[in-house]
Amino acid sequence: MSMLKRNYVVETIRRAVMLELLAAGKRPDGRGLDQQRELKIETGVIQKANGSALVTLGDTKVLAGVKIATGTPFPDTPDKGLLVVNAEILPLSSPYAEPGPPSEEAIELARVVDRGIRESEMVDLTKLCLVEGKSVVTIFVDCNIMNVDGNLLDATSYAVVSALRTSKMKKYKVEGEKAVATDEEVPVPVATTPVSVTMARIGDAMLVDPNSEEEATMDVRVTITTDDEGHVCASQKGEAGT
């Protein structure tokens, strides 16, 4: 039997077993269809960062670190600071992760998480403006995926949100057209707390927080981000393997 045919047979059997379980309202790890895995959040885990958080969602583990600097605003938003989210799936996090430049999955992950943070207006970027058109505060959030067991979108979002909520930045004073950092530290201006929830459809069943085994057989994945008031800020649809 060729490797291609063998893989097809294995995947067909795996999906059939999954559909049978879901039809009985069960999941491979014993959870209910609407039950999330255990979530643990530790903040302040990186001493040199302005803020950080380590999130464990089941066996998925994500570390987010915040670094804050000053920079030049974009020409179309001269009165707003900058927020940049990056993600890297470490080679040791999964048998399928490879060393080298960020993968398409890592790029999509950063983009979707960034959108949820940005569209919810979690950080008041206008309060990061120091000298309009010339100097603003720039917030960099770097995410390292340390272990992959499904639902990277939610785990990474929780890590970024937790890191930002506990971040401190220098207070600046403006002298003429120059911003000077003081010794005083202030919190990052957080206005709301976005919450990301990811669901997967496998056959006719919808389930919350899919793990890797479930993602391997899912037909569609949907991620929805809401703010403190329950308003939908962002959504993302993807199929298995995306």
Show the residue positions of the predicted features.
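Polyanion-binding surfaces on beta-sheet-dominated domains and ring/shell assemblies
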Residues: M1-T242
